[in-house]
């Protein structure tokens, strides 16, 4: 259930949706090609990850978690990433999204449930998102929060 109404269903001819990037969990997702397109962006890497024309399905929470997992600062310019780091970031996104799906996604309260009214449990596994001020699970440094492109961003200032 999409309480905040970020999503919607649209039946449209292919040419109307062809600009949407492929989901990282699709079998034909090309990490190397997507990494090259990611590195062509002149924005913060967090902003690039949220760009649904690059790859679809990575939202704010999973972007923060993927960046933490890959040890990449969300403020880093996407264009300065090495190809191998961009590929590693996309692999981290795939791992984060797969782990989240296995436990029903990320629910913080009863407003965010599936069609059967069940909450997801990935929020119990978050390493970065929503943990500002708490110690980094990797190095112990207090996590920080900032705003990037209007979105809350959570990260470790030491190991990212």
Where are these regions (language model features)?
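Structured catalytic/nucleic-acid-binding cores of DNA maintenance enzymes
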Residues: 1-160
């Amino acid at each position: 259930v999409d309480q905040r109404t970020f999503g919607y269903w649209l039946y449209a001819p292919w040419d109307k949706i062809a600009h949407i990037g492929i989901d990282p969990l699709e079998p034909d997702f090309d990490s190397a090609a997507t990494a090259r397109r990611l590195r062509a962006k002149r924005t913060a890497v967090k902003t690039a990850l949220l760009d649904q024309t690059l790859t679809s399905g990575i939202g704010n929470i999973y972007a923060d978690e993927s960046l933490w997992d890959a040890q990449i600062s969300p403020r880093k310019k996407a264009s300065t990433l090495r190809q191998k780091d961009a590929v590693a970031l996309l692999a981290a996104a795939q791992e984060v999204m797969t782990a989240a799906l296995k436990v029903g996604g990320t629910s913080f309260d009863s407003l965010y449930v599936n069609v059967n009214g069940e909450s997801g449990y990935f929020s119990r596994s978050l390493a970065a998102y929503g943990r500002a001020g708490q110690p980094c699970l990797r190095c112990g440094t207090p996590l920080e929060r900032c705003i990037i492109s209007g979105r809350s961003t959570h990260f470790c200032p030491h190991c990212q």
